[in-house]
Amino acid sequence: MPEMPQPTCQPAQQLHGFVVRDVTPLPADLAVAYLLEHQASGATVLHLHAEDKENCFSINFPTPPPDDTGLPHIMEHAVLAGSEKYPVKEPFFEMIKLSMATFINAMTGWDCTYYPVCSNVPADLWNLADVYFDAVFHPLLDRTTFSREAYHYAPADPADPTGELVISGIVYSEMKGVFSDPEQRLSRVLSRALFPDSPYGLESGGDPVAIPDLTYEQFREFHRTYYHPANAHFFFYGDIPTAEYLAFLDERLAGYSRNGGPIEIATQPRWSRPKDIVEGYPIEPEEDAAEKTYLVLQWLTGDSTDPLDALLMYVLSLVLLGNEGAPLRRALVESHLGADLLHSGDMHVGRENTFRVGLKGSEEDRLEPFC
């Protein structure tokens, strides 16, 4: 049976260019957590050292969207389209085909971007980590990649190359699909209304209306601003010793300076009274509009990075909505104000906790009894 490893570093210890900031045994997880900082570049490392052959290497950046053009999402795609050391068109798909990775991905969140790879073969993990490190810090980011991933003009009919041109692009097309879903559209309307003074009110994935406003220069500047070691948070998990990760990073972080420090993300100032939002969405011309209304109440409730806040909201959500007999769920179902519940309960939006109660298949004149 796995046991919790003994600590191998001590607070204030210096190792491979890093200083140990904190060491925390985690008996429930059979792991020891090490928090470290690279002294030259300012990069931070969190390693959960456990007796587990499944090792994970992840590079993470706070990337709050500056607007609705989808810069974080487009950049996530673009950095994995060739780098200085690996100048192939799609190294991401080459890794999927050729490595023994148990997990490999890249993800854009509300306010951050993640690049995780996992493998239970150490040599394979180091190869994957080297490709990912070079991809995020030294991508090619040429105009062809920008046009392909963000937007470009293409014939509406591929068989008629001289015909009408329409906007295309990988992220553009992906987000058109997202925005065509009424429930996805509703979630974005709610976020914009709930966070008017915060990056969480902006579309990190990209609004198809705004994506064509993005310029190549803004794209390059976004990488220079956010994809710097001083803004990087490295996360490791598994039985590879901490010192090996630090040696790997220190060699590649040579020459970087702190360049300011990590990006701070502002939270939404609280209001003194509720706000009402009414928003329409398109349906097919022949589609019956009866009971196509969504009714939603949503609150800002606390700090999702505060363990107590997060736990209390999770428990409250379970008590009120967590099963068929839960009082709020039962009351909403038995009210017959809508066909079913919609995305209800505790939800994290970056650093913010929210609580939402929603119904779908309703009508506008049922709003007052719903509230």
Provide a role label for each language-model segment:
Residues 53-57:
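Short, conserved catalytic-motif segment at the N-terminal edge
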Residues 2-16, 64, 78, 82-273, ...:
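Charge-rich, well-structured scaffold segments of protease-associated domains
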Residues 71, 75-79:
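Active-site His/Glu-centered metal-binding helix of metallohydrolases
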Residues 32-39, 275-285:
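Short acidic-hydrophobic surface loop/beta-edge motif
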Residues 2-52:
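N- or domain-start disorder-to-order transition segments that initiate the globular core
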Residues 45-48, 221-224, 277-286:
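Short, surface-exposed beta-strand/loop micro-motifs that present aromatic residues
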Residues 60-70:
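Short pre-active-site segment immediately N-terminal to the catalytic Zn-binding motif
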